[in-house]
């Protein structure tokens, strides 16, 4: 019996989140996409012979900061300074996250003044996240973490040790 991603991911919970019309959830999912986009395009823009390299480095740093903002579990398992943890904990509401993403988007939009590169995608994605958080803020929607996507190990259909032993 082979393990597949479907055994670990709760697709019904994902669909439930998408149907919730809670824009903070949409922004959080887009934040996960931002982590990948910022890292990938930040690395890709390190190969320019231009000042755009600085914005590529900033995009990489932004991806790491977004990772800690959107996945707060990492604050507990990674050895970090108290100052950094307190800085990240400032972004626990939709309003502060909207400001956070807006400022990061502005930085990436400024990169276009030097040279139009693939960092425009980073700027667009960060802007979309900021818009989603702004909509959630103005609609007075509660900020909630997406917990419905990964299956709980206590669920009946979660693959347990016996399945892994059978594979081996």
UniProtKB/Swiss-Prot annotation:
Gene Ontology CC annotations of this record: Golgi membrane
InterPro entries named among the record's database cross-references: TVP18/Ca-channel_flower
Localization per record: Golgi apparatus membrane
GO BP terms, alphabetized: vesicle-mediated transport
Transmembrane segments: 29-49, 51-71, 95-112, 116-138
Membrane topology summary: Multi-pass membrane protein
Pfam families: Cg6151-P (PF10233)
Glycosylation sites: 22
Main location: Golgi
Keywords, comma-separated and alphabetical: Glycoprotein, Golgi apparatus, Membrane, Transmembrane, Transmembrane helix
Function: Golgi membrane protein involved in vesicular trafficking.
Similarity remark: Belongs to the TVP18 family.
PANTHER family: CALCIUM CHANNEL FLOWER HOMOLOG (PTHR13314:SF2)
Protein name: Golgi apparatus membrane protein TVP18
Lineage, highest ranks first: Eukaryota, Fungi, Dikarya, Ascomycota, Saccharomycotina
């Amino acid at each position: 019996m082979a393990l597949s991603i479907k055994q670990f991911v709760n697709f019904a919970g994902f669909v439930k989140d998408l149907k919730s019309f809670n824009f903070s959830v949409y922004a959080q999912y887009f934040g996960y996409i931002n982590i990948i986009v910022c890292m990938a395009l930040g690395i890709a823009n390190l190969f320019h012979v231009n000042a755009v390299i600085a914005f590529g480095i900033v995009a990489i740093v932004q991806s790491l900061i977004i990772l800690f903002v959107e996945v707060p579990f990492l604050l507990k398992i990674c050895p970090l300074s108290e100052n950094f943890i307190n800085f990240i904990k400032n972004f626990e509401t939709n309003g502060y996250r909207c400001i956070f993403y807006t400022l990061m988007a502005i930085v990436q939009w400024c990169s276009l003044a030097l040279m139009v590169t693939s960092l425009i995608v980073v700027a667009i994605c960060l802007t979309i996240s900021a818009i989603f958080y702004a909509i959630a803020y103005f609609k007075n929607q509660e900020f909630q973490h997406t917990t419905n996507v990964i299956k709980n190990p206590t669920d009946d259909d979660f693959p347990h040790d016996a399945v892994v032993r059978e594979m081996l």
